[in-house]
Amino acid sequence: MGLAWGLGVLFLMHVCGTNRIPESGGDNSVFDIFELTGAARKGSGRRLVKGPDPSSPAFRIEDANLIPPVPDDKFQDLVDAVRAEKGFLLLASLRQMKKTRGTLLALERKDHSGQVFSVVSNGKAGTLDLSLTVQGKQHVVSVEEALLATGQWKSITLFVQEDRAQLYIDCEKMENAELDVPIQSVFTRDLASIARLRIAKGGVNDNFQGVLQNVRFVFGTTPEDILRNKGCSSSTSVLLTLDNNVVNGSSPAIRTNYIGHKTKDLQAICGISCDELSSMVLELRGLRTIVTTLQDSIRKVTEENKELANELRRPPLCYHNGVQYRNNEEWTVDSCTECHCQNSVTICKKVSCPIMPCSNATVPDGECCPRCWPSDSADDGWSPWSEWTSCSTSCGNGIQQRGRSCDSLNNRCEGSSVQTRTCHIQECDKRFKQDGGWSHWSPWSSCSVTCGDGVITRIRLCNSPSPQMNGKPCEGEARETKACKKDACPINGGWGPWSPWDICSVTCGGGVQKRSRLCNNPTPQFGGKDCVGDVTENQICNKQDCPIDGCLSNPCFAGVKCTSYPDGSWKCGACPPGYSGNGIQCTDVDECKEVPDACFNHNGEHRCENTDPGYNCLPCPPRFTGSQPFGQGVEHATANKQVCKPRNPCTDGTHDCNKNAKCNYLGHYSDPMYRCECKPGYAGNGIICGEDTDLDGWPNENLVCVANATYHCKKDNCPNLPNSGQEDYDKDGIGDACDDDDDNDKIPDDRDNCPFHYNPAQYDYDRDDVGDRCDNCPYNHNPDQADTDNNGEGDACAADIDGDGILNERDNCQYVYNVDQRDTDMDGVGDQCDNCPLEHNPDQLDSDSDRIGDTCDNNQDIDEDGHQNNLDNCPYVPNANQADHDKDGKGDACDHDDDNDGIPDDKDNCRLVPNPDQKDSDGDGRGDACKDDFDHDSVPDIDDICPENVDISETDFRRFQMIPLDPKGTSQNDPNWVVRHQGKELVQTVNCDPGLAVGYDEFNAVDFSGTFFINTERDDDYAGFVFGYQSSSRFYVVMWKQVTQSYWDTNPTRAQGYSGLSVKVVNSTTGPGEHLRNALWHTGNTPGQVRTLWHDPRHIGWKDFTAYRWRLSHRPKTGFIRVVMYEGKKIMADSGPIYDKTYAGGRLGLFVFSQEMVFFSDLKYECRDP
């Protein structure tokens, strides 16, 4: 019954198992891309090489274009699997060439119009880029610090679920990434009909360069199982924090909160219905009858086998030539044949005779093989004589010779090896002198031996002719010998020396020990005989009586091994780990003292506790994370040191940012350590984010924010027009930017000369289009309303413009506060506003708008940071911001003690604030003097956009320098800039010549973002922003045109501007003017003026009344530049990494060219590490 039941279960398992997800590559749970493309077979485009996994092939990619795509039917299976799982696991091992950019996988459209999806390893930027194209829009998500292009083998595990992505490199978890669209919106049902899957093939210059192995899509398992199988530690499970929130009411297909494969219902596992199960039960009942019959048959066979086994147990016998022999018995048939009995089988073998190294070998009577015998004959051992040589002379007396060879191994070979005789052919003419000449060489003699190594010999005579009449004798040797080789001579084996006796099996009472020897002196070779005798030998040892065990009294320290000797003495072994001593007395070792870095050192404290025995490390300090080692002994402490790393909530998933927000890590010294910032298209406090249509940082609807409830949580008072300041003069809930009558005086703002002051009469005494009610100089024409000292009295009518107490007519800096009126160069312009304070230049001419007068401007800048060498506080180290916190004339970038407190920067816990006492009350590594305010500018670090620069704490363009780029001519006006939101929003209102509004803050590495909006249907030209500004001839510009158009003036050069976003570097040899104007309009390169670094290949222009959000990242140290432009929540254009080191930083600003009503809103800049 048990057998029948077991067979039934096996049958059921077999039926159900047909629908399991196997782990091999022949199902839809694992898709090996190389195998599917046929690349695993020999072919062009790749070369088979050795990889880290010896069980599968690795390929060096030589030409990815020649590697075929995945077949459509297999690709369709993959698409179905991705859609069913709502994600995938991508595994790959790669060795990518250093600093290269290469595509691992790509879904390429069959019509060659682009890619639907790609995974690209960007070695230049150190990122893994995921590019998705949905409804014609490209979305790029980058996983930062993915250092794959190192020339070393790396293993990646990419886990994509819905709109989330998680990357592991080897066993290390990278930062979470969020896709802009769910992955299943890319892997549509009809994807296989419009696209194909390619490996290593990307766009132009994006093919993978290096070696790939085990590129596979995996389904039906978890990242934790994959990483565990790779040998990653179990702590990896703690890092699996990818959000698996319920989407549209359904749970994700790939889960990360359990171990093992995902659970499926019975129907999904077995794939059979209840009716089929009922039918199977009936069949099993029939099977039971058959099995019962089989049991009876097996029982009968068992009995027969027992009888047969009894027969086989009888001692085996052999019969040979009618004689019976016992098992293992040996006998000799004749002198050349020996036999033995083995398990009833007679085995006979012929004796193999070696080759004899002599010519007189004979077979003795009663033996099988011949022997060499010594001989008394003088000719024994010699080979036969060779033939006589030719006569050595053609005339006169000559000689002939012949030779023979000796077998010197077995014979004495008495006698000569050469015989000589005279010969005479004819008489010679002796009347003249002649030199001697050699005769021909004699034939070579036979080899001197019949086996092994011997020699052969030949001779010649100086008689062809013989020297006469004082002729010269022959030169050279008369005899020549060389080696000859016969078959190797047989060598009989000889015993080597006995080995020492091994250790006796007991220490007393009589034991056994043995020794052995080898047949290797010499080893039998070339048919020689084996050694005769035994290989091993035994003898009795330690016959004396056993003494009393001295270890029975436990004389050693607990845990120490005790060794007893025959004479009753004993010996203790080494002390246990964690102790030191002689084994009898052991004392605890202080591992914390012996290994001073065994545990984490924090603020000079070694966080280690010594125990008896062993030690343990204290937990990592607050805001740090790491292991807590413990153990025993110095060796353990040295090999298992504690490592505590600063905790980063943004990467370990412990932050509470909204899913539509980005987590920005501020450092482990900040409290809190991170800041949440809503992504483009959303607004709020980062914990709660709501829709933001106009991208000005304010949500469309009120949000219920817990803390600081009014900050960017209040409903946008102009939801369709950017107004980051939310100004509302009449408090009617409609922002000034979209309120047609802000002051409610019944006069529309576009005709109101005081739109923010109630003045229905519209009086304007000075006719400057600014009404008397709001005119800061009502009797002086001043449409710009400039008010330098912000006292309410305009500059046009103020007696003291800068408010320094010195009247304008006596003030040498009318627009700059300078009570001392110092004027070093006596040019009438005070030092505070003099662009050449040490050189006389009353005209203050500054042709290149770099704030250095032409008189003292030499433009010599070796480090390209925008500050000429004689004015640069670090002339050989780029530091565009010129930060100098101790005001010692040496910039922080090249100053080893930035705060001049006597503590070197690398040891100072407040690098920018003097604190010689280095007091740190909470022991977090940040001194009390700069706690929560590193640069001591009274702005908390969490709110400070440049926490390491006391001169910059918030974004502010209220003060800016206007730079005209085409100052000559009257075809258009200069730009007109309106400042709002305390300098965080600017509006350019007129159709104008190219111009800039450049702020005065200077930056090294910087992030710059803002909202771009064209609030008119008129015109279709350029607007954008500048960065790295150093002068009007040297800057980077990002500019955007709506439609393709040629510039109306073709002089001095023809300029064709294409629609789309461009990134350009300006290095003009002429400066502002018509050359630079046309070069800026032109999309492309203009020698001596402008070079285009990148232009949007899709040529997408801006749209009227549409909000866009840009994000710029500039890292001058590496030359990294990246510009991303969002339209709403989606990325509209992405330059990707651009590298250019023309300028090492500078100022930021805004750019317009022939375009009116350009809104630059919610401007933000932030200092970044280089």
UniProtKB/Swiss-Prot annotation:
This is Thrombospondin-1. Glycans are attached at N248, N360, W385, S394, W438, W441, T450, W498, T507, S553, N708, N1067. The lineage of its organism: Eukaryota, Metazoa, Chordata, Craniata, Vertebrata. InterPro entries: ConA-like_dom_sf (IPR013320), EGF-like_Ca-bd_dom (IPR001881), EGF-like_dom (IPR000742), Thrombospondin_3-like_rpt (IPR003367), Thrombospondin_3_rpt (IPR017897), Thrombospondin_C (IPR008859), TSP1_rpt (IPR000884), TSP1_rpt_sf (IPR036383). It holds the Pfam family TSP_C. Disulfide bonds join C171-C232, C391-C423, C395-C428, C406-C413, C447-C484, C451-C489, C462-C474, C504-C541, C508-C546, C519-C531, C551-C562, C556-C572, C575-C586, C592-C608, C599-C617, C620-C644, C650-C663, C657-C676, C678-C689, C705-C713, C718-C738, C754-C774, C777-C797, C813-C833, C836-C856, C874-C894, C910-C930, C946-C1167. GO terms for cellular component: cell surface; collagen-containing extracellular matrix; endoplasmic reticulum; endoplasmic reticulum lumen; external side of plasma membrane; extracellular exosome; extracellular matrix; extracellular region. It comes from Homo sapiens. GO terms for biological process: apoptotic process; behavioral response to pain; cell adhesion; cell migration; cellular response to growth factor stimulus; cellular response to heat; cellular response to tumor necrosis factor; chronic inflammatory response.
